[in-house]
Amino acid sequence: MAAGDYRSEVVPHEERPDQEPKGQDTVVVDHELENGRRLYRPTRWQSNLTILSCYIANFSDGFQNSLANPTNVIFKQLLGPSGYPSEMQTRISNALLIGAILGVVALGYISDMTSRRAGLLFTSGLVTIATLMSALALQVHPSHNMLWYFVIVRGICGFGVGGEYPPSAAAGIEESDDFKRRYRGPIFVSFTTLMATSAAPIQMIVYLVCLKASNNNLPVTFHAIYSIATILPAIILVLRFFMTDSTLFHYSNFKRQKKSPRFYWLLVRKYWPRLFTTSLAFFLYDFINFPNSIMSSSIISSLVKDHNIQTTAIWQVILAALPVPGVLVGAWLTNAIGRRYTGLVGFAGYVVLGFIIGGTFSKLSQHMAAFVVLYGLLQAFGHLGPGATIGLISTESFPTAMRGMGYSVATAFGRTGAAVGTQCFTPLQEAAGKSATFYLAGGVAVLGMIVYWFLPESGDLNLEEDDRALEEYLAQNGFSMERKA
């Protein structure tokens, strides 16, 4: 079967014995059923392939993001503090983030105006090439040139990683809605936050195994972890040649839409409250989550008494694994209490633990196990709440035709928050001590709770009804959407 094939079948409205009421499991394209036309429906294996590729892709993206921790340790050991100053460490960390911001914005638009599949093929190819270039960084001399080369290629990789988010999130939520509507929230969390979070401890285990196998040979370890990181997007690239766009996107998109400045203004005018609140919530969460994740290696390394690189890596594995149960609880809570309240619970835990760790840091840092457990619980609450729900809310809050763009704007603000937070946390830590960063995280989490209160409860939204509402709104304002047969 060709990559773009789909199953065509006539499904009369009155002859479907298994049809469920709206809002349940089965997606029904109303206008097609009423007219007795042939339905566009991706085959089950194509839908499953799309979701599978989203699982692997988000794992790959999490693997890419978590590479910052071992990279910082390796470069600091190889080059020393003078050869790898804090400002260069910040540049390398921010390169992936800034690239991600540009990629998110560009691919959010492209995936809505062309297709999810085209955007995903491009991003997978770009991440593969850029990661391979990163693996060759230690061959560049002198070290100053090598660091700048690494900044550039990580920025390119970041463009691909960031560009992955809008089409992947949109395609995943649409296929989940096709498959099991009432479970689309937990399914979405499982292939986004759970995969990205699980990638961190697995990446650290790979790093630790490479250290052991090479007898602490850091250049060999560096090449090994980046080579493995190259394989993942290459596999995804192959899988995505066989995927196709979802039913929702097939019937509701802007491919043939006449787009003037007024057209975009109409979209902003209708959806600006959702756009503003999701973007602000994303900004606040990433402002504290990314710096805390990236800086964990430096904090733990400074607390290990003999500065042994393997001991540091073992503690990092434990710390990286602790948030995973939080994601599982968050996935369950998205349906149990709703997306919004799940986010509030997570931010509340972040507030409490942030201030506890900050207030007891001087004594806590003398007991590594206690520190790692509390630090891990802090991260677990973050991943349970906003980590599990902000991407889900941002994806569900916009109709299909502009889902990529809406999600991309919110995510771009999130990545901007991550870049700003990374830029702020390192100088703050150097000026006021490590405890100050936890106080800041707790304070920002309070703001996050306030913003979350105003977010829509996106689990109650019917994606098809939102699509029809957008079509009617545009028609009333002189823009009739041309629907594909």
Locations of the language-model features?
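Transmembrane-helix signature of 12-pass secondary carriers
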Residues: 2-485
